[in-house]
UniProtKB/Swiss-Prot annotation:
This is Alkaline protease Cc3. One of its GO terms (molecular function) is serine-type peptidase activity. Coiled coil: none annotated. Belongs to the peptidase S8 family. Serine protease. It comes from Coprinus comatus. Its EC number is 3.4.21.-. Keywords: Hydrolase, Protease, Serine protease. One of its GO terms (biological process) is proteolysis.
Length: 12
C-alpha cells in the first residue's frame, strides 16, 4: 500500500 515500509509487512 501507500504506507508500505521496507522493514514491515505490506500495508503497514
Amino acid at each position: 500500500g501507500l504506507t508500505d515500509q521496507k522493514s514491515a509487512p505490506p500495508g503497514l
